[in-house]
Swiss-Prot record:
Pfam families in UniProt: Acetate_kinase
Signal peptide limits: none
Residues reported to bind Mg(2+): N9, E381
Catalytic site: D144 (proton donor/acceptor)
Catalytic activity: acetate + ATP = acetyl phosphate + ADP
Subunit structure comment from the entry: Homodimer.
Protein name: Acetate kinase
Length: 397
């Protein structure tokens, strides 16, 4: 292999990576370092069908990066790495596209910590570690938020005093932008249309879930807001909720802001509604056996999603297709059916057999021939990051 891009996604206690072949766009090696900060921190590598896990020499990001370098050296892949791409959750309004990393860019990412206090500090740690280990290689940041920077003011502003936007950056930002960009391009190919003439509603459904309106290839609206808490029902996040809940729970239960925020982020969503699990697969199995909480959670999830598909159609302007992606979107034929069956008034008619076939990596159309298309598309954020990195590093063909 002549050339590859190392893609890094750094969390507070984890470091996920993928080595992407520049020519084939295939992942040659992937891995995950987890439990960073704990004594049993370990790293798992997947390469050529083999899976190996080893304890790290120290429980930190630097040790994880050293382990990746050693592994790449062992299998003679280290010299193929020509650039490094970093996933960064929040780029604020400054980063409207991916960016080559220098000290100025890193400082701007640090300024966005207030908008993503759980994510951006870890990204900066990963970036600085990678620069130290690979000082001669170009490094690129690819932002979850940048795709959504094309939203018009009417979509991103909250109806609060404008000084809060001007002075405190209070607005809708959105997440999952790298996934949306990849999936929007793939959807246009499946529909046989140019991307800049394609209007879609795309639902990225995983433990974190969001939905976006794409108008002629650009983001026109999205469900996540200032933070990833707004919008759809998620695994453990509530999604949309009346802000007065904070005052109500403070009075009724003596809860403070931090405990309410924690509850809405970590104890709500599918988990809170079902009182069983945040895992969609477990809930579908339990619901099939008659578990009332599981049935309730899935029903609320599907209704909220269907409602959002309808409202996002306004942002899209027209509906060339509805697209499902992410772990749940790509694999839950049950939830896709529950959503589409509520959207007949938008011209969607489910093809049950096609829907059942689109699981475990199978993409395709899941609606009838005379219906507005609904598509299942497998996202590939790592490839999108690698392609951006190659382009900005001057390595693209």
């Amino acid at each position: 292999m002549n050339s590859s891009i190392l893609v890094i996604n750094c969390g507070s206690s984890s470091l996920k990576f993928a080595l992407i072949d520049s020519a084939s766009h295939e992942a040659v090696m992937t891995g995950l370092a987890e439990k960073l900060g704990l004594a049993d921190a370990c790293i798992t590598f997947k390469h050529n069908g083999d899976k190996q896990t080893a304890l790290l020499s120290a429980p930190d990001h630097a040790a994880a990066m050293h382990a990746i370098i050693e592994k790449l050296q062992q299998v003679s892949l280290l010299d193929s790495v020509k650039a490094i791409g970093h996933r960064v959750v929040h780029g604020g309004e400054h980063f409207k596209q991916s960016a080559l990393l220098d000290e100025t860019a890193i400082n701007e990412i640090e300024r966005c910590i207030k908008l993503a206090p759980l994510h951006n500090p870890a990204h900066i740690l990963g970036i600085r570690t990678a620069i130290k280990e690979f000082p001669s290689l170009p490094q690129v940041a690819v932002f979850d938020t940048s795709f959504h920077q094309t939203m018009p003011e009417k979509a991103y502003l909250y109806a609060v005093p404008m000084k809060l936007y001007r002075e405190n950056s209070l607005r809708r930002y959105g997440m999952h932008g790298t996934s949306y960009r990849f999936v929007a391009e793939e959807a246009a190919k499946m529909l046989g249309k140019p991307a800049n003439e394609t209007s879609l509603v795309i639902a990225h459904l995983g433990n974190g879930a969001s939905i976006s309106a794409i108008r002629n290839g650009k983001c026109a609206d999205t469900s996540m807001g200032l933070t990833p808490l707004e919008g759809l029902v998620m695994g453990t996040r509530s999604g949309d909720i009346d802000p007065s809940v904070f005052g109500y729970l403070a009075t009724e239960r003596g809860m403070d802001i931090q405990s309410i925020t924690n509850m809405l982020n970590k104890e709500s969503g599918l988990l809170g509604l079902s009182e069983l699990s945040n895992d969609c697969r477990e809930l579908e199995e339990a619901a099939a056996k008659g578990h009332e909480g599981a049935k309730r959670a899935l029903e609320v999830f599907a209704y909220r999603l269907a409602k959002y598909v309808a409202s996002m159609s306004v942002g899209a302007g027209r509906l060339d297709a509805v697209v499902f992606t992410g772990g749940i979107g790509e694999n839950s034929s049950f939830l896709r059916a529950e959503v589409i069956n509520q959207l007949g008034f938008l011209g969607l008619k489910l093809d049950a057999a096609a829907n059942e076939a689109c699981i475990r990596g199978n993409a395709g159309r899941i609606t009838a021939a005379d219906s507005v298309p609904a598509l299942v598309i497998n996202t590939n954020e790592e490839l999108m990051i690698a392609m951006d990195t190659a382009k900005l590093a001057g390595l693209a063909n």
